[in-house]
Amino acid sequence: MTGVQTCALPIFIRDNPDAFDTALKRRGLPAQAKNLLAIDERRRAAIAKSEQAQARRNAASKEIGQAKAKKDEAAAQALMAEVNELKATLPQLEAEAKAAEDELNTVLATIPNAPLAEVPEGADEHGNVEHHRHGAKRDYAFTLKQHFELGEALGMMDFETAAKISGARFVVLKGPLARLERALGQFFLDVHTGEHGYTEVNPPLLVSDDTMFGTAQLPKFAEDQFSALSGREPREVAIDALNVAIQEARKTDVDPIDDEARFRSFYDSAWNSVPKQVRRWLIPTAEVSLTNLVREQIVEEGALPMRLTAYTPCYRSEAGAAGKDTTGMIRQHQFTKVELVSITRPEDSDAEHERMTQCAEEVLKRLDLPYRTMLLCTGDMGFSSRKTYDIEVWLPGQGRYREISSCS
């Protein structure tokens, strides 16, 4: 069949509609199985009709030759009429199949991952459960300052200059503090690659729509991302190209503007010469690039687990951060982060998740930072997650634990 790419409804949903709806309910979402099954049935029916019409057209085309060989002109003419009718019908059938396909994909793209049974139910962060903690909070005999107060007082953290350069929620780190950030990143990488079995990767920071979709950043979280378009607006480039072409033509020929057909030809040529603008997304986390290293690939079982790490800048617009704490270096638009990604067999996923969390905790233990590990509830964990641990470090200046790592 031509013109229709199929995307079947996940087998789990078709075979377990009640369990699927129960998982959505735990996420605080309405049932979707009945709607998805109905859309998929329309899609499959439309594809079947299109395939049947295509098969009949192919068969009739062969029969035309057979009829002509028998000198049965009437039969040949009738078959040719049938082929033409089928040829005219096929685009509509393919369009119906694609419409159902697009509808199915649109709905599926809005559905989060199903939480594991041990994930607690809850509406927001208040439903999270402390899993364990490590290290004792220290007492100090003096008034504590917050990180940004210390950084600014020492001349190593400059929010004002960063705001002039880029706007709010950026920072310039200077001197020993800039070196400390770099050293911490290198320390994390050395531990994870040298002791935990991860392979360091230096991935692209600008990625495509498909790459963002593959890690569930799109379409749901588009407003939380930064994107960049290459080149100028196509219309501006086309106008410039058209003006150049007209000026060149005027040197040797009549003015093409006086001839509507020639002007249209010049315009079409100018427009077709314009390079198309390409959108790329700045990664919100290196997880996006690392996970997509194996997208649409078949990985040999013997190569698993595949453990990857990267130290990269990350970019987030955090459009939904209104009303949340953005003090100092909290919820910056740009920050650096060491990412861990493991590609495993499905049956090894839970154990690998626990191991990854322990790897993240290990660097905090070596830095002697008190922390606690929280098991997120269904209403607070990420869209693509089945189970998430947040590791929260104790910040003495704020007198509270703050998230420093999220392991899903």
Show which residues each predicted segment covers:
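Structural signal for well-ordered, non-membrane alpha-helices
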Residues: 21, 47, 54, 61, ...
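Short, charge-rich amphipathic alpha-helices with coiled-coil/heptad character
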Residues: 14-40
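Phosphate/adenylate-binding "loop-and-lid" substructures adjacent to NTP/NAD/dNTP-binding pockets
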Residues: 67-170
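Charged, solvent-exposed faces of alpha-helical coiled-coils
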Residues: 16, 35-38, 42-56, 63, ...
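Short, small-residue-biased leader/transition segments that mark boundaries at the very start
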Residues: 2-9
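Short, flexible helix-adjacent loops and helix caps
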Residues: 25-29, 65-72
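A residue-level signal for conserved active-site and pocket-lining positions in enzyme catalytic cores
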Residues: 13, 39, 112, 311, ...
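TRNA-recognition modules of translation machinery and tRNA-sensing kinases, especially anticodon-binding
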Residues: 132-408
